[in-house]
């Protein structure tokens, strides 16, 4: 496939490894969840591998609660840090900052949610990079499962549901 054949015009010129040829191959997993229960936060997860004349990994995850929960925020970031630290002690800090910048909403002067991690153009060592991306996926699965088990059966009020509608609808 090519970027231009996908209706992306000259976007390929900004992509590493395209040079004069807009050919690419891409594979990814993207999960976006907005639950009925306002106690369960919206969650986003994405991993990808893109190949032009060379390949790289990217991805991340973030959580956007409608209702404040400092315990969830602390636990979520602790789990992310543990997963990142298995591969590089600098990853969590680096990728959290990237996520904070990437998902900042300047028109609202606020972050999208409680943050997470975001990374792109990982191409140092294919085996190590793939192992990290796999770890991010497993971390998301475990975080999502734990949140669902803890919060999905929790009752909510009409006011909490209205907060959810407002948060999602703006």
Residues covered by each model-derived region:
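Single conserved hydrophobic/aromatic residue that forms the stacking wall/gate
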Residues: 1-12
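A short linear-motif detector with a strong N-terminal bias
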Residues: 3, 23-27, 41, 95-98, ...
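A broad, low-specificity signal for short, low-complexity segments enriched in glycine/proline
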Residues: 10, 19-24, 134-139
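Long, contiguous internal "core" modules enriched in hydrophobic/ aromatic residues
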Residues: 55-157, 162
